Amino acid sequence: MHAAVIAFHPRRKPRLARLGDWMATNRRLILGVQWAIVLFYAFLVVLPAFLPHPHPEARLFSGDFGASSFVDGEACAPDGTPLPPQDKAPYAAQWHERLVLLAQYLFWGVWWPFVILSILFMGRVWCGVLCPEGALAEFASRHGRGRAIPKWLRWGGWPFLAFVLTTLYGQLVSVYEYPQAALLILGGSTVAAVAVGWLYGRGKRVWCRYLCPVSGVFALLARVAPVHFRIDRAAWDSHPGRTAAVDCAPLLDVKHMTSAAQCHACGRCSGHRDAVELSARSPNAEVLAGKTPRTSEALLLVFGMLGVAIGAFQWTVSPWFVALRQRAAEWLVEREVFWPLEANAPWWLLTHYPEANDVFTWLDGALILAYVSGVALVLGGAVLAGLTFAARMSKIDWRALALSLIPLTGIGLFLGLSMMTVTHLRAEGAPLGWLSAARGALLAVGVLWSGWLGMRLLFDHAPNLQRAVLALPGLGLALSVAAAAWILVFWLW
């Protein structure tokens, strides 16, 4: 008689879960990557600010495929007779000019647009693994004073306020175009992050959790990411013995975490109590759960990301802004009020680069603030009106319904930030015949995705079918207003 031997093998974890565990056990490697990015970040932001501004015709590839993009529209014969526009020899850019252009392209044309995409697809991995500002803030916190976090700092409205103020200030100093302005804003933010980290917390990312200007934006976009760290509450509670607390840098209660919004996806908690693992999910799951976000989060989405951000991307190409500026200048001249037309503001207050023939008057600054604020109030107000109407008809909270706009908002931010990418590529003579169709396809995806989420929320949570149907015009208004703003920018202006 032979005894049968039965061997039990532990369940092999899915690939994503194993990736999360790898992140947890390879913290030193991740730290090395973070410090490498810190150095690269410093190179992109600091060095160009101390180099001369490039010549207006300097190009990264001025001797390569970009050469044909240079056209002389003012060519004249020896006797002064104007000649038809014709190709001219490209300007021979110096090494420091190419370096500044490369830094601008990499930082604004590649880095930031694809950070937005990474949040949409992978959650806040950028924050937990790659962000140089977060790494510096945590390092300072590990060697700082370790004070308790004051109540005023934990106010939920800081992300909204910081995003709005940073965006407005960035437009006044032309942060996308000039390295000095970029160093002022981004360097200032980094210094503030280090200072907050040194003062508060103990090895935590207090700045990232409560004060970072883009933390609120990333928290909203991460809600539709198809991967997240899933918490198995039953496994957590049934795990034998005591375990050390999770070293969660953004100060989350990991056991009760149900949203990817604040999770930095750093992987430190992966495998904890055999209850935390990196997992795939439906990108719609968190929005369709119908949980109500904080009012400050909903306002950031409606008036910040769909208002201020669109206004900031829009004013530089808006004929309405040009007409407003012209009319205001004429009005001032007629009344002999000339000081608003003076361009004597310092560069750190208003754009002032005479060598690049780019200076803002006091009138320009006032009108930029007025235009962006006006767009925010009009667009945000219209979106809020539509959401409020739909919410009242369907008897659901408007803040929960606002989350359905995240896909359209995220895609819109990517399209807006990629305008700088397009500017650089067009200057180099890159073929862009595909651009209009690509923009249209992405915008359509955003509208359809957000529309589908909104309808699902209405029909799933409204008390009856009739109320859900009555709410549809409100949802349609919110979607139409947001889409129309981008249609103006890309196709009508």
Q: Where are the predicted features?
A:
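Non-ligating segments of multi-cofactor redox enzymes
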Residues: 2-261, 271-493
